[in-house]
Amino acid sequence: MSGAGPPPRGEGAGGLWRPSASWDVLRLRAALLARIRGWFAARDLLEVETPVLSAAGTTDPQIESFTTHYHGPGAPYGCTAYLHTSPEFPMKRLLAAGSGSIYQICRVFRQGEAGARHNPEFTLVEWYCIGADHHTLMDEVQGLVTEVLAGSRSLGEPERMSYRTAFERHVGVDPHGASPAQLRTCAARHGLETGAGLGDRDADPWRDLLLSHLVVPHLGRGRLSLLYDYPASQASLARVRPGDPPVAERFEVFLDGMELANGFHELADAGEQHRRFERDRYRRRTAGQPSVAPDERLLAALVAGLPDCAGVALGFDRLVMAACGARRLEEVLAFPFERA
């Protein structure tokens, strides 16, 4: 029949063709991006671009990469490729090759992350400063966020405290000295029933539970809160400072009760990095997660020599949420996953 066929795409999509963010918010996004680039330009950081599609995924058991398969020149039998979860590894390769201090603004991808403050595809602002440690980089993050948000909202005086101090203040326990059983008892005392099944062998799941439920809700209320010196077992790609207890030289930044940034005094020891990759892979195997090979090109760069530096990844979409008072990520994205 003449005229028969599927309805126009817009009608069949039930209105999902429209952006979920308002035009005012989308214009604000553009303005904030321009301010961020201006902030870096004033400090003479080089903007870089690295591949979104990589031969290596993340070994981190807490993060799953999107995978795809490449067929073509250079891989006659095909090969698995990964959408990056962070530009960290190739940026460190640039640092080892002599780039100097650098930054990047890019889209990254993480499997299974969706919700009020998560989207499988999101924007990171990531930068590395030569000669800096995690305390110096906390100053940088504080300065960038305060300056970029200045036209949208004013913030109170930032607060800084160690991971231990935050736990002692809001949970009433020393997170470094408490056993898993003691942390479980603490969770029960605070009425947390979601810890069932975490077991008594590893303290970190209990620390994460207590942090997310009892500490983070108090952080960043009208001001930036910066936590630093995390348990050594949570070092990820940060250096560990010897002591009693040893601590990871890393920090997280919170605003409006949500994590905004995560930074490290970067590990430069290739042997230690390889050992951490292997620990991650063991945990993935025991948890039944997909196997991921370590990034050999990163390890080669560390062998060549990573300069002393600190790096941080800041969630740009959450920064926009903070600027305009949004409660859900979809309010600051043109097309969240449901509309992609």
Q: Which positions does each model-derived feature cover?
A:
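Class II aminoacyl-tRNA synthetase-like tRNA-binding/catalytic domains
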Residues: S2-T136, T194-G195, V216, M321
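Conserved structured core elements
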Residues: L26-A30, A34, A42, E47, ...
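Short amphipathic C-terminal alpha-helix that caps PH/PH-like domains
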Residues: M138-V148
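Active-site pocket scaffolds in enzymes
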Residues: A270-A340
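Metal-assisted phosphate- and nucleotidyl-transfer catalytic regions
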Residues: E147-M258, R279-L306
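A generic structural signal for well-ordered coil/turn residues at beta-strand boundaries
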Residues: Q62, Y77-C79, S99, H118-L124, ...
